[in-house]
Design a protein with these regions (language model features):
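Asp-based, Mg2+/Mn2+-dependent phosphohydrolase catalytic module
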Residues: 85, 89, 105-206
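An amphipathic alpha-helix signature
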Residues: 4-8, 43, 47, 105
Length: 206
């Protein structure tokens, strides 16, 4: 949200903050098929949105400031959830641990390296999207039956519900910020997945 707020500040002479937020979100969603998920696509969407809202009058200086916002996102430290390393240490020798993420390959590789957690994982996969077919294809490639797979994630839409649909299990760990595109209206609780409040709660179940 911090980047979106700064973006709105850059365009405050053209529109209200609420309108800017709405238009940026629309532009992001429209561009997902072109750019995929990731910071670079977000940067391009910021520029496109700024041009649209300003009727192509936005200055090169302002566009430069938007690029700087994107670079700040790329270089910012990785925020680890409390207990994540404790959980990984406990599970590493018991299970085959896999990172499944979506977005720009370079961005995600950089994040994993910064996190210092790569040693705990047996496999890393960066998907173009997180839908049922993406997961089914990957599990088939890795020779893992859905019934033998447990997903742990913070997004119901991307990390939990698609896995439940293909017969896998999932644990939902809510995060304090969720992108609007990842929100699910009226999710059905206990429909093949469980929700816990902290990562370390996982150790009670696996």
């Amino acid at each position: 949200r911090d980047t979106e707020n700064k973006f709105a500040d850059l365009l405050e002479k053209y529109e209200t903050k609420n309108k800017i937020d709405q238009e940026l979100f629309k532009t992001e969603i429209k561009n997902l098929d072109l750019y995929g998920y990731g910071i670079k696509g977000f940067m391009l969407s910021m520029i496109e949105c700024a041009l649209d809202l300003s009727n192509n009058e936005v200055s090169s200086k302002t566009i430069g400031a938007m690029l700087d916002l994107g670079k700040e996102m790329i270089t910012q430290p990785v925020e680890l959830l409390n207990g994540v390393e404790e959980v990984l240490k406990s599970l590493k020798d018991k299970y085959r641990l896999i990172v499944l993420t979506k977005g720009d390959l370079l961005d995600q590789e950089r994040k994993l390296e910064k996190s210092g957690l790569s040693e705990y994982f047996h496999h890393v996969e960066v998907l173009s999207d997180k839908k049922e077919k993406n997961y089914s294809d990957l599990l088939e490639h890795l020779q893992i039956l859905p019934s033998e797979f447990l997903m742990i994630g913070n997004s119901l839409k991307s990390d939990v519900l698609p896995l439940v649909e293909i017969g896998a299990r999932a644990i939902h760990v809510p995060f304090h910020t969720t992108w609007e595109h990842e929100k699910v209206k009226d999710p059905i609780e206990n429909n093949g997945y469980m929700t816990i409040s902290t990562l370390t709660d996982i150790l009670e179940y696996v």
